[in-house]
């Protein structure tokens, strides 16, 4: 046999983790000869599609071939190597926007000149939140090892979105417009910024 599938019970005798099934569970064991990565994808993706289509209780399942994301792109856009693509929030690299002459945020420019990058994370429908909401996020970021978070609140003024908040005054109108376009921002959104060396 050059290949076979085997569905069998598995007894896990090791420490449990959040992404592991504890104790007994069923697994699909695959043995294949003389294959490469693409052969594995072509064999497995239809099985997963049929499995979740038949037993997914009516939930929508992506059709093969499944979307593939490079590790570096996944870490940049989602902050994890196993993202939940149902979550619409993405992380954006806005380093080049911070280099603009009409952005006067000198602390970021200084860090960028030393090799740092700037990432931005939108927070939909949060611009009307109280100051304590933003302070809590900032404190959390510091607890996680970041130097802090800058943020801009987007509000509509005469049919145009404008940037408010602690660092909004350092951005010219054209720079705000580019942020809105690049980061897919809308009215009442907040955009958080973090600047540090890439890790």
Q: Which ranges hold each PLM region?
A:
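Class II aminoacyl-tRNA synthetase catalytic cores and aaRS-like
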Residues: 1-199
């Amino acid at each position: 046999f050059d290949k076979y599938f085997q569905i069998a019970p598995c007894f896990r005798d090791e420490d449990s983790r959040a992404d592991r099934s504890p104790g007994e569970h069923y697994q699909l064991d695959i043995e294949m000869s003389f294959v490469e990565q693409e052969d594995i994808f072509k064999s497995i993706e239809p099985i997963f599609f049929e499995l979740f289509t038949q037993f997914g209780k009516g939930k929508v399942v992506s059709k093969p071939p499944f979307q593939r994301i490079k590790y570096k792109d996944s870490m940049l856009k989602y902050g994890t190597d196993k993202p939940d693509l149902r979550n619409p929030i993405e992380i954006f690299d806005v380093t080049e926007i911070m280099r603009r002459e009409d952005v006067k945020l000198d602390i970021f420019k200084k860090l960028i000149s030393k090799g740092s990058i700037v990432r931005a994370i939108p927070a939909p429908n949060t611009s009307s939140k109280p100051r304590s909401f933003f302070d809590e996020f900032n404190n959390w970021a510091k607890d996680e090892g970041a130097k802090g978070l800058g943020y801009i609140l987007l509000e509509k003024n005469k049919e145009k979105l404008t940037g408010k908040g602690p660092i909004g005054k350092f951005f010219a109108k054209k720079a705000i417009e580019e942020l809105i376009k690049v980061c897919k921002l809308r009215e009442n959104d907040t955009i958080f910024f973090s600047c540090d060396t890439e890790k």
